[in-house]
Amino acid sequence: MNCVLTEARLVTMQPGVQGYQITEPQTLIIEQGRIQHIGQHIDLPSDAHPISCAGKLVTPGLIDCHTHLVYAGSRANEFELRLQGVPYQTIAAQGGGILSTVNATRKASEEALIELALPRLDGLLRSGVTSVEVKSGYGLTLKDELKMLRAAKALEQHRRVKITTTLLAAHALPPEFQGRSDDYIAHICQEIIPRVAEEQLATSVDVFCESIGFSVAQTERVFHAAQAHGLQIKGHTEQLSNLGGSALTARMGGLSVDHIEYLDEAGVKALAQSSTVATLLPGAFYFLRETQKPPIEWLRQYRVPMAISTDLNPGTSPFADLSLMMNMGCTLFDLTPEETLRAVTCHAAQALGYPANRGQIAEGYDADLAIWNIEHPAELSYQVGVSRLHARIVNGELSYES
């Protein structure tokens, strides 16, 4: 027996059920990293050493399903320039923008990338996160994309957390392929994806499908290559315009479409006819001072599951706090606190391809939990800057975050 929790008020977050589903104080028996038994009256073996939650709320461990937390360099100077009204095109021409992060990341060693990522990861863990998705996309060469993915996977060796890695080589056009985007897509499909699959460095492949990124046709090529190598797909779609990338991703069985500020009703209907999750990224919306909001009412009307994530990255969402994103989901996108908690638990698990073992509290599920010093779950999206986390449990192992 690995762990026993007693007097735990559970917020089970089972999908498809209304409300927080708060239970009376329960006992949880955890064995081999999974929840084996839940009940009010369970006979414990004589050698058990139960941990009393003393009536504290216990939720599923939070899941940050979209991050770029492995990178080198800073974009703080770019932030200042943007506030002064300098256009992004001018910043990029002066060596700034995403390619400045690419240059810094290429120069950094795998070990340096790990050290730089750990403080960002620590911020997420302090907000109750137990699972994190990490994308590549700042290398844009075979060598550097592999380096980023290896660094991301290595984070599990330094912190008690579950890392899911995603290949995002189709994030931007590297300088070496300027004016030859189709050639770069061919390089991704023929060289990068096969190597990533062979070394099992990622479970999914993402594409920035946008007017300043890659076309729908190019995105489809990458998706076909990914699926041919047994990898899942997902898309950065409809952030700046409505190209139809979300509908493509849904039609091809993608895990999630992310950003989606410009998603139209036809795109929402395409999501509703699939199992693809709509991932909202309020941090980027806020940081870029956008005004076009995701179509929340349509997503509700057509019952499309919504996830929320930090989109932690140096250029458009430098935030390492998932509770802040929950608050922004409420204040900027008019979600309810219940919707935001669902968005970082069961729906986020679905967005990563883990709907059957993460994101809710139920027998047989992974023992990834967060124990909170709060009276009601709405407090998680209500107050920002004061940690209410008592402890995390990852694979049945207790961890206290300072």
Curated annotation (Swiss-Prot):
Can you state which reaction this protein catalyses? Answer: 4-imidazolone-5-propanoate + H2O = N-formimidoyl-L-glutamate
Q: Please provide one cellular component term from the Gene Ontology annotations of this protein.
A: cytoplasm
Q: Which Pfam families match?
A: Amidohydro_1
Give binding positions for 4-imidazolone-5-propanoate: R75, Y138, H171, Q239, T316
- Residues bound to Fe(3+) are H66, H68, H236, D311
Print the keywords alphabetically.
Answer: Cytoplasm, Histidine metabolism, Hydrolase, Iron, Metal-binding, Zinc
Associated pathway: Amino-acid degradation; L-histidine degradation into L-glutamate; N-formimidoyl-L-glutamate from L-histidine: step 3/3
What is the protein's given name?
Imidazolonepropionase
Instruction: Say which species the protein is native to.
Output: Vibrio cholerae serotype O1 (strain ATCC 39315 / El Tor Inaba N16961)
